[in-house]
Amino acid sequence: MRFMITCRIPVEKGNESAKAASLDSTIQSIMEELKPEAAYFSEIEGARSGYLVVNIDDASQISAIAETLFLGLGATIQVHRVMTPEELGQATPAIEQAAQKKDG
C-alpha cells in the first residue's frame, strides 16, 4: 500500500545538521534506506520538512520507518494512506455502497 509520510525537522536540529554539513548526507542516507516512490522537500510552519511517498506491505514496517526519521533527523511525522486516481476509482463502488447503507 502507498503511504505519504510528512516529516518535520525541528529548526534547532536542522540548523545543527546544516552547520555540521551533515544534513544532505543524512537525507540521502534516509532516501537510500526508504526508497520512496517520490520525495519532496519544503517547509511546514517555518521548519524544514519533507513529503515521502513510500510503499508499505505490512503495517509493522511503519515503526522502522518512523525510527529512521526520528533518529536521523529528530523529525516528527504523520503517516497517511494515499491512493492514485486509478486506485480511488477502484474504491469508488465500495465508498458509494457504504454511503448508501449509512443513508438507508
What is the role of each PLM region?
Residues 1-104:
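Conserved, structured core segments of small domains
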